[in-house]
Amino acid sequence: MSRIGKLPIKIVDSVKVDINDNIVTVEGKRGKLSQEINSRIRVRVEDSNIIVERSLDDKQTRAFHGLYRSLIFNMVKGVSDGFSKSLTINGIGYRVEQQGTSLFFNLGYSTQFEYVIPEGVNIRLEGNTKIAVEGIDKCRVGQVAAEIRSLRVPEPYKGKGIRYDNEVSRRKVGKSGVKK
């Protein structure tokens, strides 16, 4: 039995779960998410828990068991609490501005970067160097944060770039060449 897959998912009072064929739909105060489930995996609601079971015991089905349990758990958590990732911009002259549904980044290049904010994700700016990415879909929030970070990955010498708030990046010592 999968260590993750065998754990039941607790349904919060404000969350409604609907299972039709191979589609699980979770609806809560923040929104609605749905996920198609592989036919080898069975999902059922029992009391106030979601139980994920597998029909076969081959390697691929065991992998799907834990995967779909985690996806459904993240859906339940997302529609009730939501997810967020925070990013910080470090560097002289590095900043971000929001205009409508686009972010404009000045990151030390000769041109500005324009990033169009996708549907289902909210972006909040705190000053011009802090970005908060929020939404109900954990995968989409993480993807948007990773795309923003990839515009200027932190470099190891001065630490300039866009980094996650909880990220610890390795710093290097610069050259210490001996003059002759």
Swiss-Prot record:
Disulfide bridge positions per record: none
Gene Ontology MF term list: rRNA binding; structural constituent of ribosome
Transmembrane segments: none
Pfam families assigned: Ribosomal_L6
Keywords assigned by UniProt, alphabetized: Ribonucleoprotein, Ribosomal protein, RNA-binding, rRNA-binding
UniProt xrefs under PROSITE patterns: RIBOSOMAL_L6_1
InterPro entries reported for this sequence: Ribosomal_uL6-like, Ribosomal_uL6-like_a/b-dom_sf, Ribosomal_uL6_a/b-dom, Ribosomal_uL6_bac-type, Ribosomal_uL6_CS
GO biological process: cytoplasmic translation
Cellular component GO terms, alphabetical: cytosolic large ribosomal subunit
HAMAP family in the cross-refs: Ribosomal_uL6_B
Subunit details: Part of the 50S ribosomal subunit.
Cross-referenced PANTHER family: 60S/50S RIBOSOMAL PROTEIN L6/L9 (PTHR11655), LARGE RIBOSOMAL SUBUNIT PROTEIN UL6M (PTHR11655:SF14)
Purpose of the protein: This protein binds to the 23S rRNA, and is important in its secondary structure. It is located near the subunit interface in the base of the L7/L12 stalk, and near the tRNA binding site of the peptidyltransferase center.
Family from the record: Belongs to the universal ribosomal protein uL6 family.
Protein's UniProt name: Large ribosomal subunit protein uL6
Source organism per UniProt: Borrelia hermsii (strain HS1 / DAH)
Gene: rplF
